[in-house]
């Protein structure tokens, strides 16, 4: 059955209008943002009875996890978002939105001559902008005049990031908090604002319950989904060799590293001869000494490429090697039709899916670096256990209450964090000291940041599952669950040589003398590149195991061994 785009599968009058909360699951590249942009512009919709209903433009607050997506929306001429994140953050008061909504801009659209004037009704911003906006503007006495009554719909794009990014950011907490507060205001009849959460990677949200009167729309199997044709598993050495060969042949490639240091090492050393045709992109630059001319040039070139991608939704034609980090795993479109190969170091499902989906034309090959070191949690596992103690939370909030009293803020009186620098500094200190607590502006208290724990647990479990599958020879099965439409295989030459050897020697599933096993082992050591004692430990990642041929001392096969292919049912 032919896959459809999201707009072809959703009817606003039946799927959106009746509900305060709508959860949309559809694959990467299915047109989620196109659908939301249509809500902001207004459009005509066919009804089941044949009528065509005109849907008026909605005021949309689109919250996304990546600045690149905001820049993309800002720079696109035919979208209905009239501002950018920095303008939104610099609003002095909530009331400034009134004059913003009353202003107009020129909009060019497909299907019209020239341009049309539209009211600047909708805003796109990052998760971080929501955190800063709450700090600057939220007051309990103005709750009924806050964002939920300034917009018709709050859309959370890349909703999985509310959990996924929680491991290293506080901003996702405030997006989650805004969603919950908006739903409470809606249930209390104080707003008609709807919340739409969208993602193409719902796995990390599996434990989330649908709120009362919520509507779940799962179109993962019905809608278009950008997936690579082939997913290949290889170690770092083999990946670098493959990259060299492809670059030498004139191809363009993308490499997603887990660390900035890896990006810089590849740029400076491994692919130095291609520096004039290479580009880098990453967030953190504290590893670079800005006093050095080379580092300043790297940062300038990085900023240029990031701005180019945001404006053009593609890499420059003269760039053949793009080295980046998870900064660009979501929120951007790379529409180059001549990029067919990508390499990724991540071992988590949601990150792999998001990274592969950046190239909208689709990849021919996605390489997963099987021996790449994964990022790990910096704090002790006891941190969350300690943070879960109610007496600690009560103590932090009692101290906060004392700080407010010292500042002359009466109990339960409305106040603004922005107006009290001392309290603002105390909140920042507590959140740094206790990373599993966040100050909640709506609750006016420190609350447990459980999404952070969920995020760290998810990535730890993903890494453990990858390691276990690798040791047990089940990597192909694991990755096949990530990309069900793709062909999954080992790319490495070691695997090919080992498979070819066993096929040619015809030594599988037959009793072997110890001398024959030693001869096989000696050959395998030359392929792997190092000696080994435990056959199963070293050969399971390649899909082979060894066992005794017989435990019966009277059997002619006693003392012999049998080598089998894992998964054949004969182990």
Annotated model-derived regions:
Residues 16, 39-40, 382-571:
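The feature captures the C-terminal accessory region of ATP-dependent helicases
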Residues 78-135, 305-309:
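Inter-Walker segment of RecA-like/P-loop motor cores
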Residues 345-366:
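Conserved SF2 helicase motif VI
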Residues 333-345, 366-368:
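A short beta-strand element within the Helicase C-terminal
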């Amino acid at each position: 059955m032919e896959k459809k785009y999201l707009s072809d599968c959703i009817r606003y009058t039946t799927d959106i209008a009746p509900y305060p909360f709508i959860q949309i699951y559809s694959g990467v590249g299915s047109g989620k943002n196109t659908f939301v942009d249509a809500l902001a512009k207004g459009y005509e919709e066919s009804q089941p009875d044949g009528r065509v209903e005109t849907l008026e433009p909605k005021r949309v607050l689109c919250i996304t996890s990546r600045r690149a997506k905001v820049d993309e929306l800002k720079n696109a001429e035919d979208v209905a978002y009239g501002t950018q994140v920095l303008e939104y953050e610099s609003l002095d008061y909530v009331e400034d939105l009134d004059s913003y909504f009353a202003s107009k801009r020129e909009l060019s659209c497909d299907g019209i001559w020239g341009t049309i004037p539209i009211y600047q009704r909708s805003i796109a911003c990052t998760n971080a902008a929501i955190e800063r906006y709450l700090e600057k503007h939220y007051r309990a006495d103005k709750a009924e005049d806050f964002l939920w009554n300034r917009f018709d719909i709050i859309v959370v794009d890349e909703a999985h990031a509310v959990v996924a990014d929680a491991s290293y950011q506080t901003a996702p907490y405030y997006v989650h908090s805004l969603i919950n507060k908006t739903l409470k205001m809606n249930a209390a009849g104080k707003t008609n604002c709807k919340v739409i959460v969208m993602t193409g990677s719902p796995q990390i949200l599996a434990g989330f319950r649908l709120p009362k009167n919520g509507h779940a729309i799962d179109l993962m199997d019905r809608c278009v989904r950008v997936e690579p044709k082939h997913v290949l598993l290889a170690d770092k050495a083999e990946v670098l060799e493959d990259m060299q060969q492809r670059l030498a042949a004139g191809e363009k490639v993308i490499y997603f590293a887990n660390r900035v240091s890896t990006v810089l090492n590849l740029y400076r050393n491994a692919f130095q001869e291609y520096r004039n045709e290479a580009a880098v992109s990453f967030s953190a630059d504290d590893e670079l000494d800005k006093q050095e001319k080379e580092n300043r040039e790297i940062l300038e070139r990085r900023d240029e490429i990031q701005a180019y991608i945001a404006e053009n939704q593609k890499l420059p034609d003269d760039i053949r090697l793009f080295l980046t980090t998870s900064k660009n795993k979501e929120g951007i479109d790379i529409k180059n039709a001549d990029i067919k190969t990508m390499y990724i170091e991540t071992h988590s499902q949601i990150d792999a899916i998001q990274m592969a989906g950046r190239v909208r034309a689709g990849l021919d090959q996605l390489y997963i670096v099987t021996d790449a070191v994964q990022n790990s949690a910096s704090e002790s596992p006891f941190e969350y256990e300690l943070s879960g103690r109610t007496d600690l939370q009560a103590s932090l909030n009692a101290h906060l209450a004392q700080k407010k009293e010292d500042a002359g803020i009466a109990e339960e009186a409305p106040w603004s964090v922005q107006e009290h620098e001392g309290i603002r500094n105390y909140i920042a200190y507590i959140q740094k000291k206790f990373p599993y607590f966040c100050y909640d502006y709506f609750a006016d208290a420190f609350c447990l940041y459980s999404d952070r724990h969920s995020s760290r647990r998810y990535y730890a479990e993903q890494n453990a599952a990858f390691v276990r599958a690798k040791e047990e020879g089940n990597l192909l099965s694991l990755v096949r669950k990530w990309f069900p439409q793709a062909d999954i295989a080992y790319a490495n030459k070691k695997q090919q040589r080992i498979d070819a050897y066993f096929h040619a020697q015809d030594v599988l599933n037959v009793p072997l003398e110890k001398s024959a096993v030693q001869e096989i082992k000696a050959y395998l050591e030359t392929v792997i590149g190092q000696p080994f004692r435990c056959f199963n430990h070293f050969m399971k990642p390649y899909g082979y195991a060894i066992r005794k041929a017989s435990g019966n001392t009277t059997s002619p096969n006693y003392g012999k061994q049998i080598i089998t292919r894992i998964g054949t049912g004969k182990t």
